[in-house]
Amino acid sequence: MAFELPNLPYDYDALAPYMSRETLEYHHDKHHLAYVTNGNKLAEEAGLSDLSLEDIVKKSYGTNQPLFNNAGQHYNHVHFWKWMKKGGGGTSLPGKLDAAIKSDLGGYDKFRADFSAAGAGQFGSGWAWLSVKNGKLEISKTPNGENPLVHGATPILGVDVWEHSYYIDYRNARPKYLEAFVDNLINWDYVLELYEAAAK
């Protein structure tokens, strides 16, 4: 299937002051658009255009790095925009998700610390993740455009730690960006939706 740039599910000003209009304009309108444009060209050249995005990501991993980079980043960003909302974050998680975080990760405070540490500790560009693997939640980090799909897990929350995600708003203070993301931006309803789908 052809890659398409999704519209943001909120206005460009909606996430301020935690993520500015300028960041969203550059990140969505330029960076994500480039992954879509390049990904479509590379998928067509590889004869994989008819596959789903998830299948293109899995098939290109380790076999077609240019395609994987763009397909992986497109997949990651399609979800990234939905993982945020105005007035998001905080400790009031949906019950089922709260229970899973308690049983699998040791509770919200430990999740917050470990998820933020994964993002802060990713050397260079990459992502931090909350995923479902073998029925349990796990936190991980990946370089560049890689994601948990290629490691047998289903991502239900991710945060982009490429510099273009935060440099306009936070300069080199990646931990402050991660703190703002967790405390003020996460769309826990969307995380729950993905968790329930992955747990089936």
Swiss-Prot record:
GO terms, molecular function: metal ion binding; superoxide dismutase activity
Enzyme Commission no: 1.15.1.1
Cofactor: Mn(2+)
Annotated catalysed reactions: 2 superoxide + 2 H(+) = H2O2 + O2
Leading EC class: oxidoreductase
Record text on cofactor binding: Binds 1 Mn(2+) ion per subunit.
The organism's place on the tree of life at top rank: Bacteria
Keywords: Manganese, Metal-binding, Oxidoreductase
Record: residues binding Mn(2+): 27, 77, 160, 164
SUPFAM superfamilies, alphabetized: Fe,Mn superoxide dismutase (SOD), C-terminal domain (SSF54719), Fe,Mn superoxide dismutase (SOD), N-terminal domain (SSF46609)
Similarity comment text for this entry: Belongs to the iron/manganese superoxide dismutase family.
Function: Destroys superoxide anion radicals which are normally produced within the cells and which are toxic to biological systems.
Annotated PANTHER family: SUPEROXIDE DISMUTASE (PTHR42769), SUPEROXIDE DISMUTASE [FE] 2, CHLOROPLASTIC (PTHR42769:SF3)
Assembly and oligomerization: Homodimer.
Name assigned to this protein: Superoxide dismutase [Mn]
Species in which this protein is naturally found: Rhizobium meliloti (strain 1021) (Ensifer meliloti)
Lineage: Bacteria, Pseudomonadati, Pseudomonadota, Alphaproteobacteria, Hyphomicrobiales
